[in-house]
Structures are given as structure tokens and as C-alpha cells.
Amino acid sequence: AYNLIAEDYQLPRVHTHLYKRIPTQAGLGGGSADAAYMIRLLDERFRLNMGNAEMERYASKLGADCAFFIRSEISYATGIGDILAPADSESGNLNGYYLVLIKPDIAVSTAEAYATIEPQQPIKCCRDIVKQPIDTWRTELFNDFEVPVFKRYPELKAIKEKLYEKNALYAQMSGSGSTIFGIFGRKPVDIEKTFPNTFTYVCRL
């Protein structure tokens, strides 16, 4: 990210220390987020005044989903993940809901996941689905990676099913895995006890 920006702007050499707060190989876009935030940091620290659109242009050169993390907003992505548009829920956003992340000690190879996936033609555009009440998403909003990944790692499917048993309004695998997320209307209890020996995270959106 630094080298890319330095091609067009005069930047001094910098020393950065990255402290990762999320697990790696989790399907959470951690590496892409790191790249995007480096662009944001350089823009802010050195007053480059690039603006979001310009930063997204640079970010898209670094990776398919890097541009998504420039604004950190709920977005609908097309192209290779670099063409973004607002994608709100029926209430305008997901504010007030609770998000749960469960990441077991399983590392899913992104290359392997892409090699085995068979993308399905959606019956309805996901941009329209997310405008519906969240309790309708379960039967209409899918992650095509789940079929091959769950086949190889049935533990992940079990986690998703358990989240629904805990009254998640919606649950899905994140990206190519191996994190499973759940969205709840109320703060769930005993998450760490329910999913022992896993990385767990609960927050309010």
C-alpha cells in the first residue's frame, strides 16, 4: 500500500507496527482491511486529501475487496468487489443488532475454496434481499462457498446450525471461511460456553 501511494505522492519513509485483533485465514478480510487502512492512514497523516473515491481506486489495485474497507459502510459490491453502492437493510441499517463471530481452529485455503466452488445464478438480487426484513434472509441470501467448504469441514455447518438454535436471525459463513457469523436481535448469552475452544466475538452494531 505504501509503495503504491508513494508512486504518485512524495512520502517520507515510515515505520509501522501492525497489531492484528482478528484471526488470520478467517474469511474476514483482515489483510484487505490492513491495506485499506494503510492508505487511509497515509492520506490522513500526510494530508494528501485524496478523498474516498481516489483511495478506493488505489485500494482496488491491491486486492479484490480492499476498496470495501475504505469507507467501512454496508455496501453492495459488483465487479471484482471494487464497484460499491449502498446496501441497507429494511430499517436503513443494522444498528442495534448484535453480531457474533465464531472462528474454530480451522484454516480454509482461499485458493482451494475458489477451485471447488460452483457459483449459482441467484433467483433474486442480494441487493433486493437485504432491503427485506432480516428474518427473510435465511431462505434467500446464500454464500455459495458454504456447499464445498461445509462438505469438507462439517464442523462449520454445525456452528451455523447452533447459531440458529441460539435464536440468530441470520447466520452465514464469512467469505470463504472459516468464520461463521450470526446476527441477533438481542444480545446472546453463553456464547463462549456454547462454542468452546474457538475464537468468539460479540458486539452491538
Regions found by a protein language model. Give the residues of each.
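N-terminal lobe of the biotin/lipoate ligase/transferase fold
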Residues: 1-9, 18-23
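Phosphate-handling active-site elements
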Residues: 6-15, 41-62, 186-196
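Short pre-catalytic strand/loop immediately N-terminal to key active-site residues, enriched for Gly-Thr
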Residues: 14-27, 169-171
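DPxDG-like acidic metal-binding loop motif
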Residues: 26-54, 68
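Glycine-rich beta-strand-to-loop/alpha-helix junction loops that act as flexible
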Residues: 30-31, 173-178
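Conserved, helical-rich catalytic subdomain that frames metal- and/or nucleotide-binding sites
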Residues: 71-170, 185-196, 201-205
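Short beta-strand->loop micro-motif that forms the acidic, two-metal-ion catalytic signature
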Residues: 179-184
